[in-house]
Amino acid sequence: SCAGSCKCKNCRCRSCRKSCCSCCPAGCNNCAKGCVCKEPASS
């Protein structure tokens, strides 16, 4: 249940690894608790 839980624009979390959120809150613990913070593709 990460949907609606992410309210950040940049994710710098490298401790989570799954696939649920496109961003992760500060601390990468709320949304990351079972999901993953994917860093925005800087293209």
Curated annotation (Swiss-Prot):
A divalent metal cation 7 binds at residue 37. InterPro entries: Metalthion_dom_sf, Metalthion_dom_sf_vert, Metalthion_vert. A divalent metal cation 2 binds at residues 2, 13. It comes from the Eukaryota. A divalent metal cation 4 binds at residues 20-21, 31, 35. A divalent metal cation 3 binds at residues 2, 6, 11, 16. Residues 17-43 are annotated as: Alpha. One of its GO terms (cellular component) is cytoplasm. Keywords: Metal-binding, Metal-thiolate cluster. Residues 1-16 are annotated as: Beta. A divalent metal cation 1 binds at residues 8, 11. A divalent metal cation 6 binds at residues 24, 28, 31. A divalent metal cation 5 binds at residues 21, 23-24, 37. One of its GO terms (biological process) is detoxification of copper ion. One of its GO terms (molecular function) is metal ion binding. PANTHER family: METALLOTHIONEIN, METALLOTHIONEIN-1X. Class I metallothioneins contain 2 metal-binding domains: four divalent ions are chelated within cluster A of the alpha domain and are coordinated via cysteinyl thiolate bridges to 11 cysteine ligands. Cluster B, the corresponding region within the beta domain, can ligate three divalent ions to 9 cysteines. Belongs to the metallothionein superfamily. Type 1 family. Metallothioneins have a high content of cysteine residues that bind various heavy metals. This is Metallothionein A. It comes from Colinus virginianus.
